[in-house]
């Protein structure tokens, strides 16, 4: 689904692409996941890579492991890591699910 979205942006009318590219060059994120890209194409490439990386990680860990890792990451804040906060609040995180499948 996401790759179709990026392909649609690449195939957008020239005028629309120029407008998005100008906004990207001013520092605006115009593609979800394209943070820090300095042009429309750069943002699309970054977003595609991040999406593929996440999908690969999900395949390696399996759905349960990926969800468990997200649960731990979602607990982190600027003061504490996810593991510290989980321990502090009594939330159980099963890190055995983080192991990659062989």
Swiss-Prot record:
Source species, domain of life: Eukaryota
Chain segments carrying region Disordered: 1-102
**Swiss-Prot/TrEMBL GO biological process terms:** response to abscisic acid
Compositional bias (Basic and acidic residues) at which positions? 48-58
Induction of the gene = By abscisic acid (ABA).
> Which residue ranges does UniProt annotate as crossing the membrane?
none
The record's function comment reads: LEA proteins are late embryonic proteins abundant in higher plant seed embryos. There are two subsets of LEA proteins (5a and 5b), the first ones are expressed when the cotyledon weight reach 80 mg and the second set are expressed above 100 mg. The function of those proteins is not known.
The family this protein is said to belong to:
Belongs to the small hydrophilic plant seed protein family.
Tell me the PANTHER family matching this sequence: EM-LIKE PROTEIN GEA1
Remarks, miscellaneous: This is a SET 5b protein.
**Annotated protein name in UniProt:** Late embryogenesis abundant protein D-19
Organism, scientific name: Gossypium hirsutum
């Amino acid at each position: 689904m996401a790759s179709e979205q990026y392909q649609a942006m690449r195939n957008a009318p020239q005028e629309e692409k120029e407008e998005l590219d100008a906004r990207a060059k001013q520092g605006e994120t115009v593609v979800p996941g394209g943070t820090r890209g300095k042009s429309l194409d750069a943002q699309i490439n970054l977003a595609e890579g991040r999406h593929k990386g996440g999908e690969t990680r999900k395949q390696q860990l399996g759905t349960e492991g990926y969800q468990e890792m997200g649960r731990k990451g979602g607990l982190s804040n600027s003061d504490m890591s996810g593991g510290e906060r989980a321990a502090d609040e009594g939330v159980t995180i099963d890190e055995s699910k983080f192991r990659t499948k062989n």
